[in-house]
């Protein structure tokens, strides 16, 4: 039966050769333009000895069967075995040491390591050499003539600028370097010229094209352009941190409207067209622990008992967590009774919404029920429950019973709902929550004509989100918001990796290129002289007051000393030295 919820975008001829796919890297001078410089399940929900009778529960005592290619599952109105969860034996938490848990950069570098940046640097320089070897354009010159090989430090500054552009948003990339008063961002010009940024963006590359093998589907060939980076980051996500007991598997979509063999359509998502990911998140925090890119047929997936691709995707994502008592929450696209049974046999609980047209769903549940009623059927460790509250919802669970509890609805009024529904709502939204946190920092720009560069931008944002989640777990008393964490991370990246004067602007130098007075001459600290109103006056330290505290608020610190030559209040140690030796402090 066709799936009305998800359908693929019609693709071009599947016989397109490898050369055509690699042609996306062809150099186009039009790419440049002139720049104007917890696990809160209640034990009462798991009453294993008996099921509490409910007046509105339909229990006719009859049994129901469902067939599946000759095999059948016998469902009954009463649980034949105790309903209980597996003991959780996992060891959740961060697995890699951090020397300073208050430093956002150290969390980011848990994932974005020197090894990864070195690989990107190597491939970017190789791509630049390839582009520079091509004949110049119609005007007789190429902007690649101005290329100089990049290094790890410059690329990290480049990534910091990309992150900053997600916060300080402008409709056109060139506007970040415009000198028009309405658009001026002078600090960005101090960090990197627009021309250099565009050159780096044009040459940004992640894999040698000659290593991309043919003989696969178009989608799989395309994915190889970013696959080493994707695999590296996903591996880091899963080795740096182990999630808590409750996890969720769902689909995520990265917006992309250009031609792409992997492009999908998901009408239920906020972004409906683009690159589809299958994501495993920690339910409590939204930490992205594992992910797969949808490439259609030929995906490297684990086998499943029912043979369904959706089941194979789930088993692939949770494979390293099996046997430890985890509980995975799933949406109806990924659910079948046989998948739940297979997970349960691997000491993993499962909860999720189910489609009535799935095989092995009890026939009793396919009948309509009245609003406010609940009907449940049991088969071994499985429970299938149907509940109607305006709309009919069917649930599967390996440990819930048909307990109904009282909760507050959106209007604050008391209402009754099955416990399985309540637990599902509390734990299933992790992937959508992570997507929502990323929407404030969009990577969608007209410059992203090449899909894998946009996907890299998306992976960069996911890495920052995971870094923030770990930071919050290690600093529960901190009130630093996601936006302030990003700002602090960008500041630390620039402080550590930016080399003043590394890239110069074209034409006449602006005042930013002139060595400031504070970096030359003779400077000595002196006490701020007394005034008629104050015997011991103080001033705000220039360095301290430019920093932020652990809560993301600006620091205010008074000092008795100042530089007489610069007439600037400064703490003697260490701010006086910093102010007179660092161009960007």
From Swiss-Prot:
Basic and acidic residues bias: start-end ranges: 47-61
Protein name: PiggyBac transposable element-derived protein 4
Gene behind this protein: PGBD4
Domain of life according to the entry: Eukaryota
Positions with biased composition (Acidic residues): 25-40
Compositionally biased residues, Low complexity: 62-72
Classification via InterPro entries: PGBD (IPR029526), PGBD4_Znf_C (IPR032718)
Coiled coil region boundaries: none
Chain intervals for the UniProt region annotation (Disordered): 1-73
């Amino acid at each position: 039966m066709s799936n009305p919820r998800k359908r693929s975008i019609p693709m071009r001829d599947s016989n397109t050769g490898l050369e055509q796919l690699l042609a996306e890297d062809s150099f186009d001078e039009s790419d440049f333009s002139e720049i104007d410089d917890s696990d809160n399940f209640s034990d009462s929900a798991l009453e294993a000895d008996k099921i509490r009778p409910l007046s509105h529960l339909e229990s006719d005592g009859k049994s129901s069967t469902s067939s599946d290619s000759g095999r059948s599952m016998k469902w009954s109105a009463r649980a034949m075995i105790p309903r209980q969860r597996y003991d959780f034996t996992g060891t959740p938490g961060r697995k890699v040491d951090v020397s300073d848990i208050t430093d956002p950069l150290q969390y980011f570098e848990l994932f974005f390591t020197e090894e990864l940046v070195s690989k990107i640097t190597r491939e970017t320089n190789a791509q630049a050499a390839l582009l520079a070897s091509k004949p110049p354009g119609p005007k007789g010159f190429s902007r690649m003539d101005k290329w100089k090989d990049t290094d790890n430090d410059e690329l990290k500054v480049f990534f910091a600028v990309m992150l900053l552009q997600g916060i300080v948003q402008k409709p056109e990339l060139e506007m970040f370097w415009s000198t028009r008063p309405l658009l001026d961002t002078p600090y960005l010009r101090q960090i990197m010229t627009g021309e250099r940024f565009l050159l780096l963006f044009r040459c940004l590359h992640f894999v040698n094209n000659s290593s991309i093998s043919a003989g696969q589907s178009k989608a799989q060939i395309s994915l190889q352009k970013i696959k080493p980076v994707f695999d590296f980051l996903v591996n880091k996500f899963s080795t740096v941190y182990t999630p808590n007991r409750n996890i969720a598997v769902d689909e995520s979509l990265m917006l992309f409207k250009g031609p792409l063999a992997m492009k999908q359509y998901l009408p239920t998502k906020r972004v409906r067209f683009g690159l589809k990911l299958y994501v495993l998140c920690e339910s409590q925090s939204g930490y992205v622990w594992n992910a797969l890119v949808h490439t259609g047929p030929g995906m490297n997936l684990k086998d499943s008992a029912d043979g369904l691709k959706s089941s194979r995707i789930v088993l692939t994502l949770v494979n390293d967590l099996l046997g430890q008592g985890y509980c995975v929450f799933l949406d109806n696209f990924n659910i079948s009774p046989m998948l739940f049974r297979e997970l349960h046999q691997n000491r993993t609980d499962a909860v999720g919404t189910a489609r009535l047209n799935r095989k092995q769903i009890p026939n009793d549940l396919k009948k309509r029920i009245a609003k406010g009623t609940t009907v449940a059927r049991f088969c071994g460790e499985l429970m299938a429950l149907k509940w109607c509250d305006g709309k009919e919802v069917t649930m599967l669970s390996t440990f819930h019973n048909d307990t109904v509890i009282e909760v507050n609805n959106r209007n604050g009024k008391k209402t009754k709902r099955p416990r399985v529904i309540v637990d599902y709502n509390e734990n299933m939204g992790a992937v959508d929550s992570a997507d929502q946190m990323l929407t404030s920092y969009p990577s969608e720009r007209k410059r992203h004509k090449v899909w894998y560069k946009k996907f890299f931008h998306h992976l960069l944002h996911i890495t920052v989100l995971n870094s923030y989640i770990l930071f919050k777990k290690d600093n529960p008393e901190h009130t630093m918001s996601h936006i302030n964490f990003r700002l602090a991370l960008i500041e630390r990246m620039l402080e550590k990796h930016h080399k003043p004067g590394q890239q110069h602007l074209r034409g006449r130098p602006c005042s930013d290129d002139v060595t400031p007075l504070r970096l030359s001459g003779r400077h000595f600290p002196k006490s701020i002289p007394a005034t008629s109103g104050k015997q011991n006056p103080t001033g705000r330290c220039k360095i301290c007051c430019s920093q932020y505290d652990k809560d993301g608020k600006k620091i205010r610190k008074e000092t008795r000393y100042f530089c007489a030559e610069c007439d600037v209040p400064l703490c003697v140690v260490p701010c006086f030295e910093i102010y007179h030796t660092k161009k960007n402090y």
